[in-house]
């Protein structure tokens, strides 16, 4: 059987749209790209299972070899939406120009599966003693649905995991989490000529904002991680809107904020800190303050710096591991085994018009992955 080339796999991935979005008009599901991946890895000798997580949303688990432990190579099969007017190329066509691959998902991160595919072909598997797994998840760009489902229902426990997000081939051992909420204040509208007729939601929100800024200062004062460029959690007040007219008492005001917690700060603990910060305001204005999540919260993640897995991958890559501020599926997969984030391309290209991956990453990435397969499976 003639196996597809690296370029053919890459082209097939990029040409198969798999956008996930909280906007139903954009959301497509990933069934078609998972079907392609399943076929390719079956032809390569893997045992493949496709799991429907929700309607139109699928994970793929591929396994080569038997036994306990082994190495899991993971990534998400979905992409973000795109602004067609800002692209110079067809987002759903792999374009080669100026020693780059252009296309939606070239860096973030469908292209990673083409690198896995090619690396498998380079390895002598006659001495394999532990399994190699490949996981392709759904909805990383929205709810992390695929990673959450896999972690809860994992049919195996690998020794180690590498997630192929674009890190410029630098091993990432930790990142902050992400929590985004809306605080909605409900007042009572009325004519501005008589403030006693209503309850001004903006005035209540003023008290909420003061409490949130106190929480921000508390997070900076009490939590510190020297491994991060920004060593404390961050709290950002990102969006606020209230009222509809200068001559009307504001009946509703809404604030959107986010927190990026450090590894080790539990989501429950962060929620308790928020409730404590707002306790006095809520007691003063009972029933008028609601907190609504904008998305499922993502905890911080860290693979312990002295873990031998980090040293082994640093040796393969010939570079030291780092921490970053953006989020991946690592907090979930880390629940199963020591996990690192490591892949081709730059995070600066993610979610951008004319997303690309430089040809400079091709050979080094295949080399790194094939060495990892040998080290942890053979």
Swiss-Prot record:
Quaternary structure (record): Homodimer.
Name this protein carries in UniProt: Acetylornithine deacetylase
One MF annotation (Gene Ontology) recorded for this entry: zinc ion binding
InterPro entries the UniProt entry points to: AcOrn-deacetyl (IPR010169), ArgE/DapE_CS (IPR001261), Bact_exopeptidase_dim_dom (IPR036264), Peptidase_M20 (IPR002933), Peptidase_M20_dimer (IPR011650), Peptidase_M20A (IPR050072)
Reaction it catalyzes: N(2)-acetyl-L-ornithine + H2O = L-ornithine + acetate
Top enzyme class: hydrolase
Claim: Metal-binding is one of the keywords in the record: yes
PROSITE patterns in alphabetical order: ARGE_DAPE_CPG2_1, ARGE_DAPE_CPG2_2
Active site, per annotation: 78, 140
Organism listed in the record: Vibrio parahaemolyticus serotype O3:K6 (strain RIMD 2210633)
CDD domains: M20_ArgE (cd03894)
Pfam families named among the record's database cross-references: M20_dimer (PF07687), Peptidase_M20 (PF01546)
Cofactor: record remark: Binds 2 Zn(2+) or Co(2+) ions per subunit.
Underlying gene: argE
Record flagged with keyword Amino-acid biosynthesis: yes
Coiled-coil residues: none
Disulfide bonds listed in the record: none
Pathway given in the UniProt record: Amino-acid biosynthesis; L-arginine biosynthesis; L-ornithine from N(2)-acetyl-L-ornithine (linear): step 1/1
């Amino acid at each position: 059987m003639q196996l597809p080339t690296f370029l053919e796999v890459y082209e097939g991935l990029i040409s198969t749209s798999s956008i996930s979005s909280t906007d139903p008009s954009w959301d497509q599901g990933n069934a078609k790209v998972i079907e392609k991946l399943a076929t390719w890895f079956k032809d390569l000798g893997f045992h493949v299972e496709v799991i429907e997580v929700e309607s139109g949303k699928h994970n793929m688990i591929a396994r080569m070899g038997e036994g306990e432990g082994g190495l899991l190579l993971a990534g998400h099969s979905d992409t973000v939406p795109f602004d067609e007017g800002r692209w110079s190329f067809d987002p759903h066509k792999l374009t080669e120009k100026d020693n780059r691959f252009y296309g939606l998902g070239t860096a973030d991160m469908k292209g990673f599966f083409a690198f896995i595919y090619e690396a498998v072909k380079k390895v002598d598997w006659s001495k394999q003693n532990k399994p190699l797994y490949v996981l392709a998840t759904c909805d990383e760009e929205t709810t992390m649905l695929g990673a959450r489902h896999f972690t809860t229902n994992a049919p195996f426990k690998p020794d180690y995991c590498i997630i192929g997000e674009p890190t410029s081939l630098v091993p990432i051992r930790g990142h902050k989490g992400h929590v985004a909420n809306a605080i909605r204040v409900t007042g009572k509208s009325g004519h501005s000529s008589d403030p006693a007729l209503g309850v001004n939601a903006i005035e209540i929100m003023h008290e909420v904002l003061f409490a949130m800024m106190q929480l921000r200062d508390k997070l900076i004062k009490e939590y510190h991680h020297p491994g991060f460029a920004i060593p404390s959690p961050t709290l950002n007040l990102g969006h606020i809107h209230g009222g509809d007219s200068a001559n009307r008492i504001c009946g509703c005001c809404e604030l959107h904020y986010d927190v990026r917690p450090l590894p080790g700060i539990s989501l429950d603990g962060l929620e308790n800190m928020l409730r404590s910060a707002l306790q006095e305001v809520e007691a003063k204005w009972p029933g008028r303050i609601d907190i609504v999540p904008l998305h499922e919260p993502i905890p911080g993640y860290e693979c312990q710096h002295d873990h031998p897995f980090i040293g082994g991958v640093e040796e393969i890559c010939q570079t030291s591991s780092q921490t970053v501020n953006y989020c991946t599926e690592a907090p979930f997969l880390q629940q199963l085994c020591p996990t690192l984030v490591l892949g081709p391309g730059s995070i600066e290209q993610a979610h951008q018009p004319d997303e690309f991956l430089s040809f400079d990453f091709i050979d080094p990435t295949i080399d790194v992955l094939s060495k990892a397969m040998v080290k942890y499976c053979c």
